[in-house]
């Protein structure tokens, strides 16, 4: 009986200790998040950087720097100010895509009337490289399998040929689907809009590279894009707005939101946008008087929230943890999405002195 009482007392003490530790652990997480928000961002000199290219991880961005003889790609830690050169070329880096999840980088480099597609790991080691003699080039990179891509060559008349590339096997062959712009939706599938009668909307199709089958999904699609585990379509609506339909693996039916469109070239298109997979939030803009409001749409519920007012609508890119947004045509600013503060990432040398 005494032994049973002692065991009961020890068990009660143990449970109390565990319950006491839980709030402390939660407080530590909250304190860590608050500390993360208060970290100072150490800016880059505009004399050193042409512009930022995107997030490699939550605290590291990539940027390019060039002179008449070379272009270099650097990884830059925004909270420590430390930079590391990853890659150098005699040509010009014209496009940088980053797969933060797989820690891989895809470059397009122009040199001597050729465009090279170069695949790197996060240390800057070359995994694949191929030259194309082309007037213009489009590379659709598979975010699910970063060794797969669809490369489209354009000539001066904008005629094109599209090739499916397996970088791991160093294979390239003519794609059975000859469309210039595709969007990967899984390791083996991609979706695309075929031109419609008015050249502004068209039917949306999906193609399975494993089974070599094509399937029509829906009609009258104005715009389509995809991210990892999320895709969306836009259809025209009245009053300069579009009907957005968001799809995720968790959704049983598309989540719909009406949102303003912008006039782009000869058609309507979405405002600048990006997607935060961690938070399930689609970030975009809407005009508000002479300014623009950055807003977030929850792709699971369709709920929207205005975040911050900005003078211009410019490209944005959300960090993998959803805490920060690169903003600007050269990603020269960072928006802290919790406090809505805007910090300068790239500044003139005079401002640094």
Swiss-Prot record:
SUPFAM superfamilies: DPP6 N-terminal domain-like. Residues 1-20 form the signal peptide. It is a lipid-anchor. GO terms for cellular component: plasma membrane. Keywords: Cell membrane, Lipoprotein, Membrane, Palmitate, Signal. A lipid is attached at residue 21 (N-palmitoyl cysteine). It is found in: Cell membrane. This is Uncharacterized lipoprotein YqgU. It comes from Bacillus subtilis (strain 168). The gene is yqgU.
